[in-house]
């Protein structure tokens, strides 16, 4: 048998575990704990994310069947009630803090998306996604009269393709309300925020500019603006107009008294004309249109995590249990992104996810694994050692 530790253990050692233990100590979350520590809880819930486990029973079954693998992780079988209690009682803030500490580690890399830009500014997309919940099971998540929901308000780094801020609220919290709570000082000066027009709040846009950043957002259909003069002659495919404008209504003028730039752009592929407003006057109109197109990246991120992480079905019904599961899902996403970047894995993030799922409890080096293809993984498993179970 190879002396290489199992893949799950290798992934965990990519995490800032010393800081994690400090977070646990701050909350005294392991006080009086005899068996299932916070580290054990993290291990189990990462495993559940990687393998798509839907229930505590599924997890317990795996702990029982693969007991030798779990033993090498320092974990004995855990009763469902023990894990359920841990998810309900251990503060979810521990895992939220771990997410942001891991995010610091991921802050230096970028994806191939950056090559599409001819400018150096950091680019962030701001949006939210709603996760529906059954109100009878999750009464704390009241959204409408007969519907429950929570929202993930997110700032997404388009260059690195990872979220750099997430706020989880109940479904009633409006997008702009949550956005106004973002700490704009944490972003590098000159960051460009691309925002859906549902976030149109001129005081919020002014706050972005006051913090030393820029924004690109679609003009609302009912917005009343005064077209002052042409900013530049239309230049670039699809660019119809490039103008300087100002607001007309008193409240809009009060919230944003400065002039803005209006770029009118026609998308030939979908035969749709868009109007973008921005405070950025230096970039070309084509770049302004390209920036807004990148807003779609956050929609793809939301779609990906809903399809491939366990954030729509939950192992518990308490608020703390749900938030714990979501934060650990986000930690697992960062682990995948970090692994893909560091190993320069040429496949997609989904391919990486599927390969790791197949070998999560096997003693295979991650570096060796990512040099394989899905077809050759089985051969690698055969070389790694004998099967854990035999049918007699």
What is the role of each PLM region?
Residues 1-58, 62, 90, 97-101, ...:
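Single, function-defining residue in the core of a domain
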Residues 66, 70-72:
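Blade-loop segments of beta-propeller domains
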Residues 72-92:
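Major-groove recognition helix of helix-turn-helix-like DNA-binding domains
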Residues 141:
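A glycine- and small-aliphatic-rich helix-loop capping segment at beta-alpha/alpha-beta transitions
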């Amino acid at each position: 048998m190879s002396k290489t530790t199992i893949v799950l253990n290798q992934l965990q050692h990519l995490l800032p575990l010393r800081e994690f233990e400090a977070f646990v100590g701050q909350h005294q979350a392991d006080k009086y704990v005899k068996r299932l520590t916070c580290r054990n809880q993290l291990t189990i819930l990462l495993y559940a994310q990687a393998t798509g486990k839907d229930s505590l029973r599924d997890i317990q079954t795996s702990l029982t069947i693969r007991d030798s693998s779990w033993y090498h992780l320092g974990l004995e079988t855990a009763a469902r009630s023990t894990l359920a209690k841990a998810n309900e009682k251990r503060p979810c803030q521990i895992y939220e803090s771990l997410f942001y500490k891991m995010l610091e580690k991921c802050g230096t890399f970028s994806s191939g998306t950056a090559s599409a830009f001819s400018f150096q500014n950091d680019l962030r997309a701001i949006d939210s996604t709603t996760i529906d919940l059954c109100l009878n099971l999750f009464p704390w998540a009241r959204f409408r009269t007969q519907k429950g929901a929570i929202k993930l308000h997110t700032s997404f780094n388009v260059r690195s393709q990872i979220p750099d801020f997430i706020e989880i609220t109940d479904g009633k919290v409006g997008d702009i309300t949550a956005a106004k709570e973002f700490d704009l000082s944490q972003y590098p000066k000159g960051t460009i925020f691309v925002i859906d027009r549902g976030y149109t709040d001129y005081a919020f846009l002014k706050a972005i500019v006051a913090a030393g950043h820029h924004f690109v957002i679609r003009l609302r259909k009912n917005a009343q603006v005064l077209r002052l003069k042409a900013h530049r002659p239309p230049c670039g495919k699809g660019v119809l107009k490039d103008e300087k404008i100002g607001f007309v209504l008193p409240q809009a003028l009060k919230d944003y008294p400065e002039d803005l730039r209006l770029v009118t752009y026609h998308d030939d592929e979908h035969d749709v004309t868009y109007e973008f407003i921005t405070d950025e006057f230096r970039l070309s109109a084509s770049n302004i249109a390209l920036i807004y197109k990148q807003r779609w990246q956050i929609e793809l991120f939301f779609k990906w995590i809903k399809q491939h992480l366990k954030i729509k079905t939950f192992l518990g019904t308490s608020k703390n249990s749900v938030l714990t599961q979501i934060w650990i899902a986000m930690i697992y996403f960062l682990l995948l992104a970090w692994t893909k970047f560091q190993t320069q894995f040429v496949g997609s993030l989904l391919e990486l996810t599927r390969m790791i799922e197949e070998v999560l409890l096997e003693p295979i080096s991650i570096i060796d694994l990512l040099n394989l293809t899905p077809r050759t993984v089985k051969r690698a498993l055969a070389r790694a050692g004998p099967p854990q179970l035999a049918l007699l």
